[in-house]
Amino acid sequence: MRDALLILATQRMDGEMFLEGRKALVTGSTSGIGLAIARGLAAEGAQVVLNGFGDREEIASLCDELGATHSGADLTDPAAIAAMFDEAGEIDILVNNAGMQHVSPVEDFPPEKWDQLLALNLSAVFHCTRAAVPGMKRKGWGRIVNTASAHSKVASPFKSAYNATKHGVDGFTKTIALELAEHGITANCISPGYVWTPLIEGQIPDTVKARELSREEVINDVRLAKQPTKKFVQPEEVAAMAVFLCRDEAQNVNGANWSVDGGWTAE
């Protein structure tokens, strides 16, 4: 599945790697959606800077695979973000993908978790964008792709911080799209539904136990209840959209929030 979808993500219109000579920084890219996007961009010739945590040997292997470099910057720390950009140099493509989730009734929501989600899911998007834009302006070209969520368009109970941050990412993206449009820079969101990642896969056994349901019931009646296709989105499908948004042919695709959710937000 991954290889087939990656072919779609990197299919060339002109037989050339259209991102040759471009540098891309993808946050939260050592696994899941971010890694799929990094692979898609690297396959089109981009020099990729990975960001995220994980096993050192696995990250080194990914860097070898993609010809990439890696920053382990903690994106909840503005100083660490500034240092990451100082080390990376000017960026042509910024993918703000890093994020986290916490589920709790609002009256029980730990304040420190609220602050942590806002710092990573929203403030880091601002700090990374602020650092990347001057170089993009100097070159007269740039692409900013922000991973939002179906929860940037609709809400779900017990996800107050996540819903708030993803709605914020949507509004921020539209604002900077207007600010930067005359500089050859576009900014767009991608809003996935439930994506089949190791994180989601690992949560299924706990949900089976907590709700006393079968694995199939958890997948179909809980996780996929809102996705009319009854299929998980694959990371490579999100990557395909991100790669397209970096093409010159997408220069007038700006300020949009693209759903990749099996029809969830069409209701």
Segments (PLM) and residue ranges:
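Conserved glycine-rich cofactor-binding loop
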Residues: 23, 30-31
